[in-house]
């Protein structure tokens, strides 16, 4: 199946002008998952997938800038060609991808092509000092889309697999302000239809988490699949909890028997820099040869 899909991609991409019909876009989840260091307000940019890469990759660059436009980091990229995905390349900064901001303020993390941003993650940085003159320490925290967005991921080649919910959490959201478990519930008309096991949250800054869903009640051993979710039209609540405390609630919509994508995932969404890719590249092993392209249905807090 994967072989024939790859051949089809190659045939399509050899149609003159096909690749240029779509603007380049970064894997939004991978951008949000760029490694972050609380002790110095720093990032470590490693390989990030780019969809519909431009023909001239020399014009692609990573940048971190202030909201006023002052550049703090800017580098061109190395390109890793992924043969299993002709419409996707992996890119990483040339040289070190290490950035140490060490300052509060409003910033944007973005990728530019020929000087024009194609994907951006705006964020606000704040600093908390320990207040201990004998052990002076600072912790830098960032605020941005991590508190508002999550996504349901589905393997399009395995309809029998459970759906997975992916989100970002931090210990400040937990009842005791320390490390602990977060779980996911899916509710319809006030009734729980699916639930997950817990995911341990241990970081002060935003930590990515994901959990597969099981059916609730007497069918709790059964996977909760995309077909289960879409058998009834309506509004669903994806509830993130820590014990009995509701952390936040995301809204998902099923219409016409299909799970609806976020408005920002429309291919013609404008401004394009705020477009959210409805596909994500998943890798559970660390080897690029094991990358999988998953469907991503992004949801937002109500």
Task: Please give the residue ranges for each predicted region.
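Initiator methionine at the very start of the polypeptide chain
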Residues: 1, 19-20
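Sec-dependent N-terminal signal peptides
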Residues: 3-16
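Alpha-helical membrane-associated segments of multi-pass integral membrane proteins
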Residues: 126-130
């Amino acid at each position: 199946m994967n072989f024939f899909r790859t051949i089809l991609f190659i045939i399509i991409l050899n149609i003159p002008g096909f690749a240029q019909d779509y603007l380049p876009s970064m894997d939004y989840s991978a951008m949000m998952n760029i490694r972050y260091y609380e002790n110095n307000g720093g990032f470590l940019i490693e390989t990030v997938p780019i969809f519909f890469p431009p023909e001239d990759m020399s014009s692609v660059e990573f940048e971190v800038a202030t909201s006023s436009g002052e550049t703090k980091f800017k580098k061109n990229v190395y390109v890793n060609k992924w043969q299993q995905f002709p419409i996707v390349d992996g890119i990483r900064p040339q040289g070190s991808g290490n950035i140490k901001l060490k300052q509060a303020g409003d910033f944007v993390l973005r990728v530019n092509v020929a000087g024009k941003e194609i994907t951006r993650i705006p964020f606000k940085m704040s600093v908390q000092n320990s207040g201990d003159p004998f052990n002076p320490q600072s912790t830098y925290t960032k605020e941005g889309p991590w508190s508002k967005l999550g996504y349901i991921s589905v393997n399009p080649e395995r309809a029998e697999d459970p759906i997975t919910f992916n989100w970002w959490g931090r210990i400040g959201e937990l009842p005791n302000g320390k490390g602990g478990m977060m779980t996911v519930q899916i509710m319809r008309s006030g009734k729980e239809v699916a639930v997950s096991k817990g995911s341990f949250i241990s970081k002060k800054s935003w930590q990515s988490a994901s959990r597969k869903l099981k059916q609730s009640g007497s069918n709790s051993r059964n996977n909760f699949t995309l077909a289960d979710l879409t058998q009834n039209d309506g509004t669903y609540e994806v509830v993130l909890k820590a014990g009995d405390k509701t952390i936040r609630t995301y809204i998902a919509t099923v219409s016409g028997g299909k799970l609806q994508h976020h408005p920002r995932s429309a291919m013609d969404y404008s401004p394009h820099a705020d477009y959210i890719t409805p596909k994500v590249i998943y890798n559970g092993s660390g080897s690029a040869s094991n990358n999988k392209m998953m469907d991503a249905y992004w949801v937002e807090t109500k």
